[in-house]
Curated annotation (Swiss-Prot):
The modification Phosphothreonine is found at T187, T370, T406. The keyword Phosphoprotein applies. This is Transcriptional modulator WTM1. GO terms for cellular component: cytoplasm; nucleus; Rpd3L complex; Rpd3L-Expanded complex. Present with 7750 molecules/cell in log phase SD medium. It is found in: Cytoplasm; Nucleus. The keyword Transcription regulation applies. Residues 387-402 have a biased composition (Basic residues). Keywords: Cytoplasm, Meiosis, Nucleus, Phosphoprotein, Repeat, Transcription, Transcription regulation, WD repeat. Interacts with KAP122. The modification Phosphoserine is found at S200.
Length: 437
């Protein structure tokens, strides 16, 4: 008898949900204490006979990286939410898995799927900031950018991957390295802690002609850690640091930001992502549970608009709208959908995943009104924008907590999200919302 899906008064019913607790060929010790991360393959194979789409989830545990196939029903209008778990992982439940790739001696903290048929298939980052490129059919990395600890490097600052939501205010800087990939996949920017007393650094790295070649190193002054890096297009990217400042850069220009956005209020700026579809929208998340939606064009224009600041005041950079996690649940990750310009999810320190739709806020937004106050998180806007809350279903541990890079949108299949929990439970789901009806 299938277990029933967990329900509450919030929108948490599913169009589809399946989960798998993997078995492994080799014994895996201390599963709960091993770092996990998750992404999807972009390969999708339709099966008209069975009315399914087959793809795969890429899941890391410590130094081992696994590929797990799944099949979900073809996109159809759902008449009602499901009551039971699906069988997307049918045939895999009793299969013992062997690693597809191994980053020996490292703990994988983030992955990005590149191209199954290309020179490189998967890019992974270890928790000390090293990068490794893997190719289909080869178990070990074919390129590596290694980060070694020097005598002046703080072990804590470079190796601690503690959740931002768990850290005291003063210790948030002991967090994270990250990387971003340009839209054409030809350039990578990685962030790196450089030790307690030194600036964090950005490395601009070739991913085309000579994958792994460091093209330039940029210091981010006044910061200990730059925890998030994201590209808006092929050249413009932004970095988010522990001084609560977003810096916007151009890989073609000098080693100084082209403009900045300061966020001194609302707690620590813990997460940031930009839309892969619009190129203008981005979202910031805070340790206090506050979420802000921004228009990059308006925020940049405000830096040169002196109309209301003739005496040297800071730029008036207002977000489009703000939202919040109930109960002050900290924002530990945020990701825009790869298939929709208006949808993103946030991950709370509780492990809950909040699905947001920005259509309501954008319908009230006038980009030409440069001094309009932000749309505050009223009950109406919160209700219309928070479309779904994933608490994980009945199979998830009640002790689950939120971590970066453990949830992901599928890059091709609309509204499909994957997660991995501390106990290795891998789940994929599609929310059931009003749009599903």
């Amino acid at each position: 008898m299938p277990k029933k899906v967990w329900k509450s008064s919030t929108p948490s019913t599913y169009e589809h949900i399946s989960s798998l607790r993997p078995k492994f060929v080799s014994r895996v010790d201390n599963v709960l204490h091993q770092r996990k991360s998750l992404t999807f393959s972009n390969v999708v194979v339709p099966d008209k006979k069975n009315n399914t789409l087959t793809s795969s989830v890429i899941y890391s545990q410590g130094s081992d990286i696994y590929e797990i196939d799944f099949a979900v029903p073809l996109q159809e209008a759902a008449s009602e939410p499901v009551k039971d778990y699906g069988d997307a992982f049918e045939g895999i439940e009793n299969t013992s898995l062997s690693p597809k790739f191994v980053y020996q001696g490292e703990t994988v903290s983030k992955m990005a799927y590149l191209d199954k048929t290309g020179e490189t298939t998967l890019l992974s980052m270890s928790k000390n900031g090293s990068l490794a490129w893997f190719k289909e059919g080869i178990k070990v990395p074919i390129h590596i950018v290694q980060e070694l600890m020097g005598p002046a490097t703080s072990y804590a600052s470079i190796h601690s991957l503690t959740r931002p939501g768990d850290l005291p205010e003063k210790d948030f800087s002991l967090a994270i390295s990250d990387f971003g990939i340009s839209n054409d996949t030809e350039t990578i920017v990685k962030s790196q802690s450089n030790g307690d007393e030194e600036d964090s650094i950005l490395k601009i790295i070739d991913n085309a002609g000579k994958p792994g070649e460091i093209l330039r190193t940029v210091h981010v002054p006044g910061t200990t850690v730059t925890h998030t890096v994201r590209f808006f297009d092929n050249h413009i990217f932004a970095s988010c640091s522990d001084d609560n400042i977003l810096r916007f850069w151009d890989t073609r220009t000098s080693d100084k930001p082209i403009w900045v956005l300061g966020e001194p209020k609302n707690g620590k700026l813990t997460s940031f992502d930009c839309s892969q579809v619009s190129n203008n929208l981005f979202v910031t998340g805070f340790s206090t549970g506050i979420i802000k939606l921004w228009d990059a064009r308006a925020a940049e224009a405000a830096t040169t608009d002196l109309t209301y600041r003739q005496n040297g005041e800071d730029p008036i950079q207002n977000e489009i709208a703000n939202f919040y996690h109930a109960g002050g649940d900290s924002v530990v990750d945020v990701q825009f959908s790869a298939t929709s310009s208006s949808e993103f999810f946030t991950v709370g320190g509780t492990g809950n995943i909040y699905h947001w739709n920005t259509d309501y806020s954008l319908s009230k937004y006038n980009p030409d009104d440069t001094i309009a106050p932000p749309q505050d998180a009223t009950e109406e806007s919160q209700t219309k924008s928070l479309r779904f809350l994933h608490k994980g279903g009945s199979r998830r541990s009640p002790k689950q907590i939120g971590r970066r890079n453990t949830a992901a949108w599928h890059p091709v299949i609309e509204n499909l999200v994957g997660t991995v929990d501390d106990d290795s439970l891998v789940s994929i789901y599609k929310p059931y919302t009003e749009e599903s009806e």
